[in-house]
Amino acid sequence: MSLQATPDDKFSFGLWTVGWQARDAFGDATRPVLDPIEAVHKLAEIGAYGVTFHDDDLVPFGADAATRDGIVAGFSKALDETGLIVPMVTTNLFTHPVFKDGGFTSNDRSVRRYAIRKVLRQMDLGAELGAKTLVLWGGREGAEYDSAKDVGAALDRYREALNLLAQYSEDQGYGLPFAIEPKPNEPRGDILLPTAGHAIAFVQELERPELFGINRETGHEQMSNLNFTQGIAQALWHKKLFHIDLNGQHGPKFDQDLVFGHGDLLNAFSLVDLLENGPDGGPAYDGPRHFDYKPSRTEDFDGVWESAKDNIRMYLLLKERAKAFRADPEVQAALAESKVDELRTPTLNPGETYADLLADRSAFEDYDADAVGAKGYGFVKLNQLAIDHLLGAR
């Protein structure tokens, strides 16, 4: 088993991950600023194929045009030297005080107009660098007090902004798909579009819903006490998984951004199994495996790069374990015993109507519910087999 990443693995990292200075609400930074050029080269060394960034991760907020052009040129040169690509870009609408009440949904109209301009500029840069997706995380879109935000009006303004972004992308020939990233809270007390379900429903109200999907993040979904793997499966079912952020999280608390698999390990295993093996034996998702984590505040730069490598190692280990799980004849027998594949058989026969079903006495009148109800499904055995493979016991 090789734990060396290749470009085919499509591992990517955000500049804000390895570049996090480890400043939090209770303490100052424990690491200095990381030059984006150095980050690109180091990520290439550990086997990443891509790097992503917010606009302000690369170019400091408020930089003049000449400074911006110089930074972008240097970054582009580093991409050329390393072969890394930019699969996704996003926009920082949460750090500067101007966004304290949001960007697209700020009560202040001038802020909303400024936010849209900021995103349009990042779309231009993303297209220039070959980005394939624009992620939209509305971290400040929300409120702490119910009386402070007209939610219906806020959703109108959200829709207005996203419709304009889609039109701009099409008119410029960018063809960028957009991925909305849900999160229930933090930094706002309550964030609009808090879960994938909210976001997918909202997308249906847009002028070009086919251009919009979601970016699901492990920690964000588990903060809502939701099952990440089930949510990813539903997003795939809707054909709305446009991007994915992988990290670790211990249940519904603050956003921990741990190394992938360093939180709910069993759910991480089932997720990799879904992404790599899918329901039919082939990959269910062909996009980047993007790590959105924060190197722990306790670590120096050596620890930063070790933790970055650990994300890759964890994914590849889980991928290998999931492959062994699926190849195990006892697992296949347990899946059959649990009737997992039978769920893919339509409940109705081809062409069958409700009249036909009502006429079928075996479906109800002659159905022995007590006998069927007495049978076990063997789900615990199946789960134990998964754990055995996860722990390397098989």
From Swiss-Prot:
Cofactor requirement: Mg(2+)
GO MF term set: magnesium ion binding; xylose isomerase activity
EC number(s) given by UniProt: 5.3.1.5
TM segment ranges: none
Coiled coil (residue ranges): none
Compartments it resides in: Cytoplasm
SUPFAM superfamilies according to UniProt: Xylose isomerase-like
Cellular compartments per GO CC: cytoplasm
Predominant place of localization: cytoplasm
Catalytic activity: alpha-D-xylose = alpha-D-xylulofuranose
GO biological process, one term: D-xylose metabolic process
PROSITE patterns cross-referenced by the UniProt entry: XYLOSE_ISOMERASE
Binding site for Mg(2+) 1: 181, 217, 245, 292
Cofactor note: Binds 2 magnesium ions per subunit.
Keywords: Carbohydrate metabolism, Cytoplasm, Isomerase, Magnesium, Metal-binding, Xylose metabolism
Oligomeric form and interacting partners: Homotetramer.
Family: Belongs to the xylose isomerase family.
Protein name (database record): Xylose isomerase
Organism: Actinoplanes sp. (strain ATCC 31351 / 3876)
